[in-house]
Amino acid sequence: MNSTALEPTLEFARKLDQEDPLRHFRDEFYLPPNSIYMDGNSLGLLSKRAEKTLFTILQDWKLLGIDGWTKGTYPWFDLSEKIGAMLAPLVGASPEEVIATGSTTVNLHQLVSTFYQPEGKRTKILADELTFPSDIYALQSQLRIHGYDPSTHLIRVKSRDGRFLEEEDIIAAMSEDVALVVLPTVLYRSGQILDIQLLTDEAHKRGILIGFDACHSIGAIPHSFSEWGVDFAFWCNYKYMNGGPGCVAGLYVHRKHFGSAPGLAGWFGSKKDKQFDMEHTFTPSLTAGAYQIGTPHLLSLAPLIGSLEIFQEAGIERIRQKSLQLTNYFMYLIEQELSHFGFIIGNPKDDVRRGGHISLEHEEAARICKSLKENGVIPDFRAPNIIRLAPIALYTSYEEVWNVVQIMKKIMQEKQYKKFSNEREVVA
Protein backbone atom coordinates (compact mmCIF):
# COMPACT_ATOMS: atom_id res chain seq x y z
CA MET A 1 0.00 0.00 0.00
CA ASN A 2 1.66 3.20 -1.22
CA SER A 3 1.25 6.02 1.33
CA THR A 4 1.07 8.55 -1.51
CA ALA A 5 -2.18 6.90 -2.62
CA LEU A 6 -3.79 7.11 0.82
CA GLU A 7 -6.41 9.62 1.87
CA PRO A 8 -7.33 10.71 5.44
CA THR A 9 -11.09 10.45 4.91
CA LEU A 10 -13.76 8.14 6.28
CA GLU A 11 -14.90 7.43 2.72
CA PHE A 12 -11.44 6.19 1.82
CA ALA A 13 -11.35 3.90 4.89
CA ARG A 14 -14.68 2.41 3.84
CA LYS A 15 -13.37 1.92 0.32
CA LEU A 16 -10.43 -0.07 1.71
CA ASP A 17 -12.87 -2.24 3.68
CA GLN A 18 -14.94 -2.92 0.58
CA GLU A 19 -11.81 -4.05 -1.28
CA ASP A 20 -10.51 -6.21 1.59
CA PRO A 21 -10.45 -9.92 0.57
CA LEU A 22 -10.43 -10.99 4.25
CA ARG A 23 -13.36 -8.84 5.40
CA HIS A 24 -15.77 -11.76 5.76
CA PHE A 25 -13.65 -13.29 8.54
CA ARG A 26 -14.68 -10.42 10.82
CA ASP A 27 -18.10 -12.05 11.12
CA GLU A 28 -16.42 -15.13 12.61
CA PHE A 29 -15.52 -13.26 15.81
CA TYR A 30 -17.32 -11.96 18.86
CA LEU A 31 -16.44 -8.27 18.95
CA PRO A 32 -16.75 -6.42 22.30
CA PRO A 33 -19.93 -4.28 22.08
CA ASN A 34 -19.53 -0.53 21.67
CA SER A 35 -15.76 -0.92 21.50
CA ILE A 36 -12.88 -0.88 19.05
CA TYR A 37 -10.53 -3.68 20.04
CA MET A 38 -6.84 -2.86 19.53
CA ASP A 39 -5.30 -5.35 21.95
CA GLY A 40 -5.15 -8.55 19.92
CA ASN A 41 -1.38 -8.62 20.37
CA SER A 42 -2.02 -9.26 24.09
CA LEU A 43 -5.19 -11.36 23.89
CA GLY A 44 -6.97 -12.26 20.69
CA LEU A 45 -10.75 -12.32 20.47
CA LEU A 46 -12.98 -15.38 20.63
CA SER A 47 -14.14 -16.78 17.32
CA LYS A 48 -17.38 -18.70 16.90
CA ARG A 49 -15.41 -21.70 15.67
CA ALA A 50 -13.12 -21.67 18.71
CA GLU A 51 -16.21 -21.56 20.91
CA LYS A 52 -17.73 -24.46 18.98
CA THR A 53 -14.67 -26.70 19.30
CA LEU A 54 -14.47 -25.96 23.02
CA PHE A 55 -18.11 -26.98 23.44
CA THR A 56 -17.47 -30.08 21.32
CA ILE A 57 -14.68 -31.25 23.63
CA LEU A 58 -16.90 -30.56 26.64
CA GLN A 59 -19.72 -32.55 25.06
CA ASP A 60 -17.40 -35.49 24.40
CA TRP A 61 -16.29 -35.44 28.03
CA LYS A 62 -19.96 -35.26 29.08
CA LEU A 63 -21.08 -38.18 26.90
CA LEU A 64 -17.98 -40.36 26.66
CA GLY A 65 -16.10 -39.90 29.92
CA ILE A 66 -12.70 -41.53 29.71
CA ASP A 67 -13.45 -42.91 26.24
CA GLY A 68 -12.93 -39.38 24.96
CA TRP A 69 -9.23 -40.20 24.87
CA THR A 70 -9.73 -42.45 21.85
CA LYS A 71 -13.24 -41.65 20.60
CA GLY A 72 -15.35 -38.61 19.83
CA THR A 73 -14.97 -35.75 17.39
CA TYR A 74 -11.40 -34.91 18.41
CA PRO A 75 -9.87 -37.87 20.30
CA TRP A 76 -7.71 -36.44 23.05
CA PHE A 77 -4.79 -38.87 23.05
CA ASP A 78 -3.07 -37.48 19.97
CA LEU A 79 -4.79 -34.08 19.81
CA SER A 80 -1.60 -32.20 20.71
CA GLU A 81 0.15 -33.76 17.72
CA LYS A 82 -2.76 -33.01 15.39
CA ILE A 83 -2.84 -29.37 16.47
CA GLY A 84 0.94 -29.27 16.10
CA ALA A 85 0.49 -30.33 12.48
CA MET A 86 -2.01 -27.49 11.99
CA LEU A 87 0.44 -25.01 13.54
CA ALA A 88 3.40 -26.22 11.47
CA PRO A 89 2.69 -24.19 8.29
CA LEU A 90 2.51 -21.01 10.36
CA VAL A 91 6.10 -21.47 11.54
CA GLY A 92 7.45 -23.04 8.36
CA ALA A 93 8.04 -26.52 9.75
CA SER A 94 7.06 -30.12 9.13
CA PRO A 95 4.21 -31.53 11.25
CA GLU A 96 6.64 -33.69 13.23
CA GLU A 97 8.64 -30.63 14.29
CA VAL A 98 5.78 -28.90 16.13
CA ILE A 99 3.74 -29.79 19.19
CA ALA A 100 1.02 -27.95 21.12
CA THR A 101 1.98 -28.20 24.77
CA GLY A 102 2.69 -26.35 28.00
CA SER A 103 2.96 -22.60 28.36
CA THR A 104 5.52 -20.21 26.90
CA THR A 105 7.73 -20.16 29.99
CA VAL A 106 7.39 -23.87 30.74
CA ASN A 107 8.37 -24.64 27.16
CA LEU A 108 11.36 -22.31 27.40
CA HIS A 109 12.47 -24.15 30.54
CA GLN A 110 12.05 -27.45 28.70
CA LEU A 111 14.03 -26.34 25.66
CA VAL A 112 16.84 -24.67 27.60
CA SER A 113 17.15 -27.66 29.91
CA THR A 114 17.55 -29.75 26.75
CA PHE A 115 19.79 -27.60 24.57
CA TYR A 116 21.86 -25.68 27.10
CA GLN A 117 24.80 -28.03 27.55
CA PRO A 118 27.68 -26.03 29.05
CA GLU A 119 31.05 -27.54 28.30
CA GLY A 120 34.56 -26.21 28.67
CA LYS A 121 34.54 -22.46 28.24
CA ARG A 122 31.15 -22.50 26.49
CA THR A 123 28.98 -21.81 29.52
CA LYS A 124 27.09 -18.57 28.84
CA ILE A 125 23.64 -17.81 27.46
CA LEU A 126 23.10 -14.85 25.14
CA ALA A 127 19.82 -12.90 25.23
CA ASP A 128 18.90 -9.21 24.94
CA GLU A 129 17.83 -6.38 27.23
CA LEU A 130 14.53 -5.73 25.42
CA THR A 131 13.04 -9.22 25.58
CA PHE A 132 9.98 -10.15 27.64
CA PRO A 133 10.90 -10.44 31.36
CA SER A 134 9.66 -14.01 31.82
CA ASP A 135 12.25 -15.24 29.32
CA ILE A 136 14.99 -13.62 31.39
CA TYR A 137 13.63 -15.13 34.61
CA ALA A 138 13.68 -18.60 33.03
CA LEU A 139 17.21 -18.21 31.66
CA GLN A 140 18.48 -16.97 35.02
CA SER A 141 16.81 -19.94 36.69
CA GLN A 142 18.40 -22.41 34.29
CA LEU A 143 21.85 -20.92 34.85
CA ARG A 144 21.44 -21.21 38.62
CA ILE A 145 20.41 -24.86 38.26
CA HIS A 146 23.72 -25.46 36.47
CA GLY A 147 25.62 -23.67 39.21
CA TYR A 148 26.34 -20.45 37.31
CA ASP A 149 25.79 -16.86 38.40
CA PRO A 150 23.35 -15.11 36.00
CA SER A 151 25.11 -11.80 36.59
CA THR A 152 28.19 -13.18 34.84
CA HIS A 153 26.75 -15.89 32.60
CA LEU A 154 23.65 -14.28 31.12
CA ILE A 155 24.75 -11.82 28.44
CA ARG A 156 22.11 -9.28 27.43
CA VAL A 157 22.75 -7.40 24.20
CA LYS A 158 22.09 -3.72 24.74
CA SER A 159 19.84 -1.57 22.57
CA ARG A 160 21.38 1.58 21.13
CA ASP A 161 18.16 3.59 21.43
CA GLY A 162 15.89 1.70 23.83
CA ARG A 163 13.59 0.65 20.97
CA PHE A 164 15.44 -1.62 18.58
CA LEU A 165 18.23 -4.17 18.42
CA GLU A 166 20.98 -4.23 15.81
CA GLU A 167 21.84 -7.65 14.39
CA GLU A 168 25.50 -6.68 14.18
CA ASP A 169 25.53 -6.06 17.94
CA ILE A 170 23.95 -9.47 18.57
CA ILE A 171 26.42 -11.20 16.28
CA ALA A 172 29.35 -9.41 17.92
CA ALA A 173 28.19 -10.83 21.26
CA MET A 174 28.27 -14.42 19.95
CA SER A 175 31.62 -15.05 21.58
CA GLU A 176 33.44 -18.32 22.09
CA ASP A 177 32.10 -18.63 25.64
CA VAL A 178 28.43 -18.63 24.52
CA ALA A 179 26.69 -22.01 24.53
CA LEU A 180 23.15 -20.91 23.64
CA VAL A 181 21.32 -17.92 22.15
CA VAL A 182 17.65 -17.15 22.95
CA LEU A 183 16.06 -14.15 21.22
CA PRO A 184 12.60 -12.87 20.28
CA THR A 185 11.46 -13.05 16.67
CA VAL A 186 9.60 -9.76 17.23
CA LEU A 187 10.30 -7.31 20.06
CA TYR A 188 7.21 -7.05 22.24
CA ARG A 189 7.41 -3.29 22.76
CA SER A 190 8.55 -1.83 19.43
CA GLY A 191 7.35 -4.62 17.15
CA GLN A 192 10.75 -4.87 15.42
CA ILE A 193 11.28 -8.09 13.46
CA LEU A 194 14.77 -9.51 13.85
CA ASP A 195 16.57 -11.13 10.92
CA ILE A 196 16.03 -14.69 12.09
CA GLN A 197 17.87 -16.39 9.23
CA LEU A 198 20.95 -14.17 9.52
CA LEU A 199 21.18 -14.64 13.29
CA THR A 200 20.71 -18.40 12.96
CA ASP A 201 23.42 -18.66 10.30
CA GLU A 202 25.85 -16.58 12.34
CA ALA A 203 25.22 -18.58 15.51
CA HIS A 204 25.77 -21.86 13.71
CA LYS A 205 29.00 -20.60 12.10
CA ARG A 206 30.28 -20.23 15.65
CA GLY A 207 29.00 -23.60 16.83
CA ILE A 208 26.23 -22.08 18.94
CA LEU A 209 22.64 -23.35 19.15
CA ILE A 210 19.91 -20.72 18.80
CA GLY A 211 16.23 -20.57 19.69
CA PHE A 212 13.50 -17.95 19.34
CA ASP A 213 10.53 -16.68 21.32
CA ALA A 214 7.84 -16.32 18.63
CA CYS A 215 5.03 -15.01 20.85
CA HIS A 216 4.71 -11.75 18.90
CA SER A 217 5.12 -13.25 15.43
CA ILE A 218 3.08 -16.47 15.36
CA GLY A 219 -0.15 -15.77 13.50
CA ALA A 220 1.07 -12.34 12.37
CA ILE A 221 3.99 -13.02 10.03
CA PRO A 222 5.17 -16.04 8.01
CA HIS A 223 8.18 -18.04 9.23
CA SER A 224 10.54 -20.60 7.70
CA PHE A 225 12.07 -22.13 10.82
CA SER A 226 13.02 -25.45 9.21
CA GLU A 227 14.53 -23.87 6.11
CA TRP A 228 16.45 -21.34 8.20
CA GLY A 229 17.82 -24.10 10.43
CA VAL A 230 16.48 -22.62 13.67
CA ASP A 231 17.20 -25.12 16.44
CA PHE A 232 14.08 -24.48 18.49
CA ALA A 233 11.27 -21.99 19.05
CA PHE A 234 8.41 -21.51 21.48
CA TRP A 235 5.31 -19.31 21.60
CA CYS A 236 1.92 -18.65 23.14
CA ASN A 237 -1.32 -19.15 21.23
CA TYR A 238 -3.52 -16.53 22.89
CA LYS A 239 -2.36 -13.40 21.05
CA TYR A 240 -2.66 -13.35 17.25
CA MET A 241 -3.66 -17.03 17.32
CA ASN A 242 -6.91 -16.29 19.22
CA GLY A 243 -6.72 -19.46 21.30
CA GLY A 244 -8.08 -17.85 24.47
CA PRO A 245 -6.62 -16.82 27.84
CA GLY A 246 -4.25 -19.48 29.13
CA CYS A 247 -4.39 -21.38 25.84
CA VAL A 248 -1.89 -24.22 25.49
CA ALA A 249 1.33 -22.96 23.91
CA GLY A 250 3.46 -24.40 21.12
CA LEU A 251 7.04 -25.36 20.46
CA TYR A 252 9.17 -26.29 17.48
CA VAL A 253 12.32 -28.42 17.39
CA HIS A 254 14.32 -28.91 14.19
CA ARG A 255 14.31 -32.52 13.07
CA LYS A 256 18.12 -32.69 13.24
CA HIS A 257 17.65 -32.80 17.02
CA PHE A 258 15.15 -35.66 17.00
CA GLY A 259 16.36 -38.41 19.29
CA SER A 260 17.85 -35.98 21.81
CA ALA A 261 16.49 -36.76 25.26
CA PRO A 262 14.30 -33.93 26.59
CA GLY A 263 15.75 -32.13 29.57
CA LEU A 264 12.44 -32.45 31.41
CA ALA A 265 10.91 -35.89 30.88
CA GLY A 266 7.26 -36.74 31.40
CA TRP A 267 4.92 -39.49 30.34
CA PHE A 268 3.25 -37.58 27.51
CA GLY A 269 6.65 -37.24 25.87
CA SER A 270 6.72 -41.00 25.38
CA LYS A 271 6.34 -42.81 22.09
CA LYS A 272 2.60 -43.23 21.73
CA ASP A 273 2.77 -47.02 21.46
CA LYS A 274 4.84 -47.21 24.65
CA GLN A 275 3.16 -44.64 26.87
CA PHE A 276 0.66 -46.98 28.51
CA ASP A 277 3.13 -49.82 28.98
CA MET A 278 3.79 -48.01 32.27
CA GLU A 279 7.48 -48.94 32.26
CA HIS A 280 9.91 -47.03 34.44
CA THR A 281 12.24 -46.69 31.46
CA PHE A 282 11.33 -43.58 29.48
CA THR A 283 11.09 -44.10 25.71
CA PRO A 284 10.81 -40.62 24.20
CA SER A 285 8.93 -39.85 21.01
CA LEU A 286 11.14 -39.39 17.96
CA THR A 287 9.34 -36.13 17.11
CA ALA A 288 8.75 -32.78 18.82
CA GLY A 289 6.19 -34.71 20.85
CA ALA A 290 9.07 -35.82 23.07
CA TYR A 291 9.09 -32.36 24.65
CA GLN A 292 5.65 -32.77 26.18
CA ILE A 293 5.70 -33.34 29.91
CA GLY A 294 2.30 -33.98 31.49
CA THR A 295 -1.27 -34.59 30.42
CA PRO A 296 -2.46 -31.92 27.96
CA HIS A 297 -4.83 -29.24 29.22
CA LEU A 298 -7.61 -30.20 26.85
CA LEU A 299 -10.10 -27.46 27.64
CA SER A 300 -7.36 -24.89 27.01
CA LEU A 301 -6.35 -26.69 23.85
CA ALA A 302 -9.80 -27.08 22.32
CA PRO A 303 -10.41 -23.48 21.12
CA LEU A 304 -7.22 -23.61 19.10
CA ILE A 305 -8.75 -26.19 16.75
CA GLY A 306 -11.42 -23.79 15.55
CA SER A 307 -9.03 -20.88 15.43
CA LEU A 308 -6.55 -22.79 13.29
CA GLU A 309 -9.28 -23.71 10.82
CA ILE A 310 -9.71 -19.98 10.18
CA PHE A 311 -5.97 -19.54 9.68
CA GLN A 312 -5.96 -22.40 7.19
CA GLU A 313 -8.69 -20.70 5.17
CA ALA A 314 -7.30 -17.17 5.36
CA GLY A 315 -3.65 -18.09 4.77
CA ILE A 316 -0.76 -16.51 6.63
CA GLU A 317 0.52 -14.69 3.52
CA ARG A 318 -2.80 -12.89 3.04
CA ILE A 319 -3.00 -12.18 6.77
CA ARG A 320 0.46 -10.63 6.67
CA GLN A 321 -0.40 -8.54 3.61
CA LYS A 322 -3.49 -7.07 5.27
CA SER A 323 -1.66 -6.55 8.56
CA LEU A 324 0.98 -4.47 6.79
CA GLN A 325 -1.69 -2.47 5.00
CA LEU A 326 -3.52 -1.81 8.28
CA THR A 327 -0.41 -0.67 10.14
CA ASN A 328 0.80 1.39 7.18
CA TYR A 329 -2.60 3.13 7.01
CA PHE A 330 -2.50 3.62 10.79
CA MET A 331 0.92 5.32 10.63
CA TYR A 332 -0.24 7.51 7.75
CA LEU A 333 -3.27 8.72 9.73
CA ILE A 334 -1.18 9.27 12.87
CA GLU A 335 1.23 11.46 10.93
CA GLN A 336 -1.66 13.31 9.27
CA GLU A 337 -3.80 13.90 12.36
CA LEU A 338 -1.63 13.57 15.48
CA SER A 339 1.74 15.01 14.50
CA HIS A 340 1.30 18.13 16.66
CA PHE A 341 0.51 16.30 19.91
CA GLY A 342 3.92 14.90 20.84
CA PHE A 343 3.48 11.32 19.62
CA ILE A 344 6.50 9.41 18.34
CA ILE A 345 6.04 6.32 16.18
CA GLY A 346 8.33 3.86 17.96
CA ASN A 347 7.92 0.88 15.64
CA PRO A 348 9.83 0.24 12.40
CA LYS A 349 8.25 1.92 9.38
CA ASP A 350 9.88 -0.51 6.96
CA ASP A 351 7.48 -3.37 6.12
CA VAL A 352 10.26 -5.96 6.35
CA ARG A 353 11.06 -4.93 9.92
CA ARG A 354 7.56 -4.20 11.31
CA GLY A 355 5.53 -6.80 13.17
CA GLY A 356 1.80 -6.70 13.77
CA HIS A 357 1.34 -3.71 16.04
CA ILE A 358 1.89 0.03 16.19
CA SER A 359 4.02 1.34 19.05
CA LEU A 360 3.29 4.96 19.95
CA GLU A 361 5.47 6.77 22.46
CA HIS A 362 4.16 9.66 24.54
CA GLU A 363 5.04 11.05 27.96
CA GLU A 364 1.35 10.80 28.96
CA ALA A 365 0.92 7.28 27.56
CA ALA A 366 -0.74 5.72 30.62
CA ARG A 367 -3.26 8.55 30.92
CA ILE A 368 -4.01 8.48 27.20
CA CYS A 369 -4.65 4.73 27.35
CA LYS A 370 -7.17 5.24 30.15
CA SER A 371 -8.87 7.98 28.17
CA LEU A 372 -9.01 5.74 25.11
CA LYS A 373 -10.76 3.07 27.16
CA GLU A 374 -13.27 5.63 28.40
CA ASN A 375 -13.93 6.45 24.74
CA GLY A 376 -14.49 2.82 23.75
CA VAL A 377 -11.02 1.99 22.39
CA ILE A 378 -9.17 -0.92 23.98
CA PRO A 379 -5.40 -0.31 23.66
CA ASP A 380 -2.41 -1.66 25.55
CA PHE A 381 0.06 0.24 27.74
CA ARG A 382 3.66 -0.76 28.28
CA ALA A 383 5.79 1.16 30.75
CA PRO A 384 7.16 3.68 30.75
CA ASN A 385 5.62 5.50 27.77
CA ILE A 386 4.28 3.13 25.11
CA ILE A 387 0.78 2.77 23.70
CA ARG A 388 0.51 -0.42 21.66
CA LEU A 389 -2.26 -0.58 19.06
CA ALA A 390 -2.77 -3.82 17.17
CA PRO A 391 -5.17 -3.87 14.22
CA ILE A 392 -5.75 -7.59 13.62
CA ALA A 393 -6.12 -8.70 10.02
CA LEU A 394 -8.90 -11.20 10.74
CA TYR A 395 -11.26 -8.84 12.55
CA THR A 396 -10.14 -5.18 12.45
CA SER A 397 -11.57 -2.88 9.79
CA TYR A 398 -9.90 0.12 8.18
CA GLU A 399 -12.83 2.21 9.37
CA GLU A 400 -11.99 1.23 12.95
CA VAL A 401 -8.40 2.38 12.43
CA TRP A 402 -9.71 5.70 11.10
CA ASN A 403 -12.05 6.05 14.09
CA VAL A 404 -9.28 5.33 16.61
CA VAL A 405 -7.17 8.16 15.23
CA GLN A 406 -10.13 10.54 15.31
CA ILE A 407 -10.83 9.59 18.93
CA MET A 408 -7.19 10.13 19.85
CA LYS A 409 -7.23 13.52 18.15
CA LYS A 410 -10.29 14.54 20.18
CA ILE A 411 -8.71 13.29 23.41
CA MET A 412 -5.59 15.35 22.78
CA GLN A 413 -7.42 18.47 21.61
CA GLU A 414 -9.68 18.45 24.67
CA LYS A 415 -6.94 17.18 27.03
CA GLN A 416 -9.35 14.51 28.28
CA TYR A 417 -6.42 12.42 29.52
CA LYS A 418 -5.59 14.94 32.27
CA LYS A 419 -8.25 13.60 34.62
CA PHE A 420 -6.41 10.28 34.87
CA SER A 421 -3.23 9.35 36.73
CA ASN A 422 -0.18 8.66 34.57
CA GLU A 423 0.48 5.16 35.88
CA ARG A 424 -0.44 1.71 34.72
CA GLU A 425 -3.44 -0.29 35.88
CA VAL A 426 -3.09 -3.77 37.42
CA VAL A 427 -3.15 -5.35 33.96
CA ALA A 428 -1.81 -2.76 31.55
UniProtKB/Swiss-Prot annotation:
<dbReference type="InterPro" id="IPR010111">
    <property type="entry name" value="Kynureninase"/>
</dbReference>
<feature type="binding site">
    <location>
        <position position="105"/>
    </location>
    <ligand>
        <name>pyridoxal 5'-phosphate</name>
    </ligand>
</feature>
<feature type="binding site">
    <location>
        <position position="213"/>
    </location>
    <ligand>
        <name>pyridoxal 5'-phosphate</name>
    </ligand>
</feature>
<comment type="pathway">
    <text>Cofactor biosynthesis; NAD(+) biosynthesis; quinolinate from L-kynurenine: step 2/3.</text>
</comment>
<comment type="pathway">
    <text>Amino-acid degradation; L-kynurenine degradation; L-alanine and anthranilate from L-kynurenine: step 1/1.</text>
</comment>
<dbReference type="GO" id="GO:0043420">
    <property type="term" value="P:anthranilate metabolic process"/>
</dbReference>
<comment type="similarity">
    <text>Belongs to the kynureninase family.</text>
</comment>
<dbReference type="GO" id="GO:0009435">
    <property type="term" value="P:NAD biosynthetic process"/>
</dbReference>
<dbReference type="GO" id="GO:0019805">
    <property type="term" value="P:quinolinate biosynthetic process"/>
</dbReference>
<keyword id="KW-0662">Pyridine nucleotide biosynthesis</keyword>
<dbReference type="InterPro" id="IPR015421">
    <property type="entry name" value="PyrdxlP-dep_Trfase_major"/>
</dbReference>
<feature type="binding site">
    <location>
        <begin position="132"/>
        <end position="135"/>
    </location>
    <ligand>
        <name>pyridoxal 5'-phosphate</name>
    </ligand>
</feature>
<dbReference type="InterPro" id="IPR015424">
    <property type="entry name" value="PyrdxlP-dep_Trfase"/>
</dbReference>
<feature type="binding site">
    <location>
        <position position="267"/>
    </location>
    <ligand>
        <name>pyridoxal 5'-phosphate</name>
    </ligand>
</feature>
<comment type="subunit">
    <text>Homodimer.</text>
</comment>
<dbReference type="GO" id="GO:0030170">
    <property type="term" value="F:pyridoxal phosphate binding"/>
</dbReference>
<feature type="modified residue" description="N6-(pyridoxal phosphate)lysine">
    <location>
        <position position="239"/>
    </location>
</feature>
<dbReference type="GO" id="GO:0019441">
    <property type="term" value="P:L-tryptophan catabolic process to kynurenine"/>
</dbReference>
<feature type="binding site">
    <location>
        <position position="216"/>
    </location>
    <ligand>
        <name>pyridoxal 5'-phosphate</name>
    </ligand>
</feature>
<dbReference type="Pfam" id="PF22580">
    <property type="entry name" value="KYNU_C"/>
</dbReference>
<keyword id="KW-0663">Pyridoxal phosphate</keyword>
<protein>
    <recommendedName>
        <fullName>Kynureninase</fullName>
        <ecNumber>3.7.1.3</ecNumber>
    </recommendedName>
</protein>
<feature type="binding site">
    <location>
        <position position="238"/>
    </location>
    <ligand>
        <name>pyridoxal 5'-phosphate</name>
    </ligand>
</feature>
<dbReference type="InterPro" id="IPR015422">
    <property type="entry name" value="PyrdxlP-dep_Trfase_small"/>
</dbReference>
<dbReference type="GO" id="GO:0030429">
    <property type="term" value="F:kynureninase activity"/>
</dbReference>
<dbReference type="GO" id="GO:0005737">
    <property type="term" value="C:cytoplasm"/>
</dbReference>
<comment type="function">
    <text>Catalyzes the cleavage of L-kynurenine (L-Kyn) and L-3-hydroxykynurenine (L-3OHKyn) into anthranilic acid (AA) and 3-hydroxyanthranilic acid (3-OHAA), respectively.</text>
</comment>
<dbReference type="GO" id="GO:0097053">
    <property type="term" value="P:L-kynurenine catabolic process"/>
</dbReference>
<feature type="binding site">
    <location>
        <position position="104"/>
    </location>
    <ligand>
        <name>pyridoxal 5'-phosphate</name>
    </ligand>
</feature>
<keyword id="KW-0378">Hydrolase</keyword>
<feature type="binding site">
    <location>
        <position position="295"/>
    </location>
    <ligand>
        <name>pyridoxal 5'-phosphate</name>
    </ligand>
</feature>
